Amino acid sequence: MNAQNTIQTLTMTSFKGTVLVAGATGKTGVWIVNRLQSHHIDYHLFVRSGAKALELFGPEIIDNLTIGSIEHPEEIRAALRHADAVICAIGGNVTDPASPPPSAIDRDGVKRLAQLAKEHGIKHFILISSLAVTRTDHPFNKYGQVLTMKLEGENEVRRLYSEPGFSYTILRPGGLIDGPPLMHSMIFDTGDKIETGAIRRSDVAEVAVISLFIPEAHNLTFELIEGKNSPQSSLVQFFQQVN
């Protein structure tokens, strides 16, 4: 079977189990829930604000919700009891001085979630990071060294989930913008070589979700931005760019 046929076959497959979404009430997190629903994949949400989750997702979410903080291990453990995989979409708010710094969320929060997920036996961990995390002189690093903190979180995920029997996927999207998914081609690359670019949150969410069941996405760190205006039936085929 050639690579194209393999990709086509994989589009008929889906993930069996429940996905814990950390950061589900953020703009990207909301789209992750939407795309999980589109793929008929069960999910459980780990959120700081139950009221916001109910506002965004409606009262039917109440049985699929754990309220807690990424800074509190016992609350994370309570959420992980419902999970077979994790999609982590947490991120510090660098524009709000009252919010925890990137070191607490993008580094320590990601590390804590990954460590506890592995202890719980979660086999696959998906992290949404950022373009340019290896560039210490990037202007964004003026805000609490946010890119460096994200890279340190990434490094812990790779360290933990590179062991046999486990796997990870780390997405490094470009600048996040709004809009519906599947309206553009994608550009994937590795090695943090993409200088700049934008991508819809909805497409980041779609790529994160299909990474649950696409073997080509496992044990992969890659950058992604949108390409040409070109409606897509699936984004699976773009993994051929990095495999």
Residue ranges and their predicted role:
Residues 10-41, 46-47:
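N-terminal Rossmann NAD(P)H-binding glycine-rich loop of SDR-like oxidoreductase domains
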